[in-house]
């Protein structure tokens, strides 16, 4: 609402920041802990072949659907003429493509169980996992820096187009990189399972 009815954040940098922030904030809070809740019953998941692969694909589809919530909530900024629909759509594609690709890498390295009765916004399991902190910061800082560089050399429409193409390339190839994550996760399964068991 502040972005819609106020001119405080009308600068290019702040516009980019708030749009990307609103789209990636759910994933940065929830998806960054991927496999944390599943650590409570990881032994059961390992019983059947490719259970984890199906789980990762389901999580990806769910979070792609979840992006509709912030996208719809950003529509008043388009109606008021503050932001363009093309900007929001290109950033949404970039988020479900490249940003989710980066965040999903945590499935390989997370090995701390999160109690099933913990709040979603709790910091449980994050305070000692520096990789989660680095990834959380990078999904905010890197895209904003990248789009600022693009916009300094190209028009806004072209910059948004490049962001959309990058995002779409990762969306189209999601089965490949999710399988790669699954393969790497299975290579570390005993180390991760030990971590999940010891942190219950």
Model-derived features: positions:
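Hydrophobic alpha-helical transmembrane segments of membrane proteins
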Residues: 1-39, 52-200
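A glycine- and small/hydrophobic-rich beta-loop-beta segment
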Residues: 42
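Short helix-to-coil transition segments within interhelical loops
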Residues: 46-51
């Amino acid at each position: 609402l502040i972005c819609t009815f106020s001119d405080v954040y009308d600068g290019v940098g702040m516009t980019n920041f708030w749009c990307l922030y609103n789209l990636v904030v759910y994933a940065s809070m929830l998806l960054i802990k991927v496999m944390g809740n599943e650590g409570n019953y990881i032994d059961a998941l390992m019983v059947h072949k490719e259970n984890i692969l199906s789980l990762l694909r389901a999580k990806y589809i769910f979070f792609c659907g979840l992006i509709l919530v912030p996208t719809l909530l950003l529509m008043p900024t388009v109606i008021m003429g503050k932001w363009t629909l093309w900007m929001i759509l290109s950033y949404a594609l970039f988020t479900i493509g490249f940003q989710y690709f980066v965040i999903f890498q945590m499935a390989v390295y997370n090995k701390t169980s999160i109690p099933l009765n913990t709040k979603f916004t709790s910091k449980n399991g994050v305070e000692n996992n520096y990789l989660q902190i680095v990834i959380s910061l990078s999904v905010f800082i890197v895209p904003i820096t990248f789009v600022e560089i693009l916009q300094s050399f190209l028009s806004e429409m072209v910059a948004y187009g490049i962001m959309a193409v990058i995002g779409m390339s990762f969306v189209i190839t999601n089965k490949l990189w999710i399988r790669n994550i699954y393969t790497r996760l299975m290579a570390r399964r005993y180390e991760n399972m030990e971590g999940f068991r010891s942190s219950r």
